[in-house]
Design a protein with these regions (language model features):
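Two-component/phosphorelay signaling modules centered on CheY-like receiver
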Residues: 13-33
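Conserved active-site segment of CheY-like receiver
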Residues: 11, 86-90, 109-111
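Active-site residues of response regulator receiver
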Residues: 56-57, 87
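C-terminal output helix
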Residues: 93, 111-124
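As written
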Residues: 98-104
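Short amphipathic alpha-helix used as the core "switch/output" element in two-component signaling
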Residues: 65-79, 96
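Acidic, metal-coordinating helix/loop segments flanking the phosphotransfer/catalytic sites
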Residues: 34-52
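The short loop immediately C-terminal to the conserved phospho-acceptor aspartate in CheY-like receiver
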Residues: 58-62
Length: 130
């Protein structure tokens, strides 16, 4: 498989650590950035050669907002970046609204530890993960 460069964004340092450790087990995944807020993420995106952003849905808003506002901004300004939302929110209305933003996948934090690697593998095959 081709190497996939991934950025992780979550406002909880322990979650960032856990995601990174999980992704380090996948030989074709390279973590190129980790961010705890949307401002740091957006300010650094142009400098990073990333294929995929794995982002929490609820992070401190800062200048660029969070959730749907942040995803809309990224889709508008970085259209080639694939987005996987990692969230603990399982509200069907919110998940539907997020999927309507044409993201590449949603992974629930309360899901199986294998869900995130499966989502990335689906992306490698040109598929979405929901």
């Amino acid at each position: 498989m081709n190497t996939m460069n991934v950025i992780i964004a979550d406002d909880h340092p322990i979650v960032l650590f856990g995601i990174r450790k999980s992704l380090e087990q996948i030989e074709w995944v390279n973590v190129v950035g980790e961010f705890e807020d949307s401002t740091a993420l957006i300010n650094n995106l142009p400098k990073l050669d990333a294929h995929v952003l794995i982002t929490d849905l609820s992070m401190p808003g800062d200048k660029y907002g969070d959730g749907i506002t942040l995803i809309k901004y990224i889709k508008r300004h970085f259209p080639d970046l694939s987005i996987i939302v990692l969230t603990m929110n399982n509200n069907p209305a919110i998940l539907s609204a997020v999927l309507d933003l044409d993201i590449e996948g949603i992974v629930l934090k309360q899901g199986a530890p294998t869900d995130l690697p499966k989502a990335l593998a689906a992306l490698q095959k040109g598929k979405k993960f929901t």
